[in-house]
């Protein structure tokens, strides 16, 4: 770090005091707000979902950003120059770069997660887990760490900037190392993630619009219309919250990115101390926006904070609708996937509907002994068809033999039941439902067990013997 960077800037001291005071206020709000976000998501178990782990990570990085940047900047502004030397400058910029890049990459992870949940719900159900979220978060931190330590090992360097009360990487010097680092950092930390984020939200919007149209078309056929609509609204509501946070973050860092690109293009002399320091302050103020966004939009977060911090009740208000009903964005991103699953596989849903209809037909066509016993054993029709089939298969295993007359009745019953099932399900029906053994099981009288069969067999043998005796006596 050269001595030319330690020259005191020729600006009034009151300007430095004002900037330092603003930074301190911003940092205090960021520390308090993000601590409240972390407390809300930690204390409320319903908020601790795999998707919300990314929000907690974002709050953690914003908290650390405010805690490390604001006090140091305020201290130097009170002395009207940088007083912490090279080590303090390296620490200041390293922390700012690490936590700032982590916030950007976390927003990217949130966007990709929302994209997968809304456009590929079936795959997201299988992949969703807290362990997976933690692995992604660990990768985000390692990625940010890699970019932050590069200037410490010679690829660019950390120097004081602007009003000389803060530090940044050297984007002013026109050296190959500084220019390459500045361009790579802007591309892989800002512009490329930004393109991916807007790509995700574009396709999310198209998927939501397409799903809404399909729900309207299928509303007369499916009684799950309200569930699917609620699921779609829930997913889109949560995606909009993340989108607002992303837009605010991008707007905060865009001026700083523009300043670095101007210097990278060779026009560093056109930048004055104010044009260098003010964008940096705006960028680091992005740490305070997320708590405000969640306090305004997220009802469960508001309720948690109100109950934990009574003194904030006059600032955080809850509408009657939030108190009476659960908001659409309270549920987990994955909790509503069951209705999304049924809608995404609507061809299979029609088969499930056919199962329900066929189940009613089956109960109407059963023999009276079976129907009477079934009413005792199955008080509710809400049990799954597969469970009923298992019970009926167990009944079939108890049956070992039957007489000719009963066998004919069973055969007739199975034939009469096979036709409506085949018409209802078609070729795509589950194999279990078309299995003749399952159909015959439902038609077997409960008295047709092994003991009754043996009694019938003994009675038949006695009748045959008596008939032979009568024939012998007549002869």
Swiss-Prot record:
Residue positions, PTM N6-(retinylidene)lysine: 284
Biased composition (Basic and acidic residues): 465-475
Disulphide linkage map: 89-167
Cytoplasmic side of membrane: 43-53, 112-134, 209-240, 298-475
Residues listed as glycosylation sites in the UniProt record: 178
TM annotation in the entry: 22-42, 54-74, 91-111, 135-155, 188-208, 241-261, 277-297
GO BP of this protein: phototransduction; visual perception
Main location: membrane
Residue ranges with Acidic residues bias: 455-464
Tissue: Highest level in the lateral eye. Low level in the brain.
Cellular component GO terms held in the UniProt record: plasma membrane
UniProt membrane topology term: Multi-pass membrane protein
GO molecular function terms noted in the UniProt entry: G protein-coupled receptor activity; photoreceptor activity
Biased composition (Polar residues): 445-454
Stretch list, region Disordered: 370-390, 445-475
Residues on Extracellular side: 1-21, 75-90, 156-187, 262-276
Keywords: Cell membrane, Chromophore, Disulfide bond, G-protein coupled receptor, Glycoprotein, Membrane, Photoreceptor protein, Receptor, Retinal protein, Sensory transduction, Transducer, Transmembrane, Transmembrane helix
Keyword Zinc-finger: no
Compositionally biased spans, kind Basic residues: 375-384
Subcellular location, record wording: Cell membrane
Family, per entry: Belongs to the G-protein coupled receptor 1 family. Opsin subfamily.
Protein name: Melanopsin
Lineage: Eukaryota, Metazoa, Chordata, Craniata, Vertebrata
Gene that encodes the chain: OPN4
């Amino acid at each position: 770090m050269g001595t030319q960077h330690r020259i005191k800037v020729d600006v009034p001291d009151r300007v430095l005091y004002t900037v330092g005071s603003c930074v301190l206020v911003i940092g205090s709000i960021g520390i308090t707000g993000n601590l409240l976000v972390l407390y809300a998501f930690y204390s409320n178990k319903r908020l601790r979902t795999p998707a919300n782990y990314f929000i907690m990570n974002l709050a953690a990085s914003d908290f650390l950003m405010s805690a490390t940047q604001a006090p140091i900047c305020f201290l130097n502004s009170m002395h009207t120059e940088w007083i912490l030397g090279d080590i303090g400058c390296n620490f200041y910029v390293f922390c700012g770069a690490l936590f700032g890049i982590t916030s950007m990459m976390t927003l990217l992870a949130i966007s990709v997660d929302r994209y997968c949940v809304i456009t590929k719900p079936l795959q997201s159900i299988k992949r969703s887990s807290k362990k997976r979220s933690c692995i992604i978060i660990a990768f985000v931190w390692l990625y940010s760490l890699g970019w932050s330590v590069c200037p410490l090992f010679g690829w660019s360097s950390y120097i004081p900037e602007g009003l000389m009360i803060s530090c940044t990487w050297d984007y002013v010097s026109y050296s190959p190392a500084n220019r390459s680092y500045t361009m790579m950092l802007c591309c892989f930390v800002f512009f490329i993630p930004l393109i991916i984020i807007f790509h995700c939200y574009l396709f999310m919007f198209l998927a939501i619009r397409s799903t809404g149209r399909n729900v309207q078309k299928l509303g007369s056929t499916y009684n799950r219309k309200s569930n699917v609509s609620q699921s779609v609204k829930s997913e889109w509501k949560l995606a909009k919250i993340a989108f607002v946070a992303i837009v605010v973050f991008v707007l905060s860092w865009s001026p700083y990115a523009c300043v670095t690109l101007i210097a990278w293009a060779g026009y560093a002399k056109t930048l004055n101390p104010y044009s260098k320091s003010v964008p940096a302050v705006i960028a680091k103020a992005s740490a305070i926006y997320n708590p405000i966004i969640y306090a305004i939009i997220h009802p469960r977060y508001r309720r948690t904070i109100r109950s934990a911090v009574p003194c904030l009740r006059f600032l955080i208000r809850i509408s009657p609708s939030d108190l009476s009903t659960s908001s659409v964005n309270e549920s987990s991103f994955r909790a509503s996937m069951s209705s999304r699953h049924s809608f995404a596989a609507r061809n299979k849903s029609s088969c499930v509907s056919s199962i329900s209809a066929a189940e009613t037909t089956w109960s109407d066509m059963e023999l009276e002994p079976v129907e009477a016993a079934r009413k005792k054993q199955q008080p509710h029709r809400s049990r799954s068809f597969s469970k009923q089939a298992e019970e009926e298969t167990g009944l079939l295993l108890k049956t070992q033999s039957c007489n000719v007359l009963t066998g004919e009745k069973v055969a007739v019953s199975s034939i009469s039941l096979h036709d409506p099932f085949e018409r209802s399900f078609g070729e795509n029906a589950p194999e279990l439902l078309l299995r003749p053994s399952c159909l015959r099981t439902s038609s077997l009288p409960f008295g047709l067990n092994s003991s009754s069969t043996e009694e019938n067999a003994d009675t038949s043998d006695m009748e045959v013997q008596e008939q032979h005796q009568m024939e012998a006596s007549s002869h």
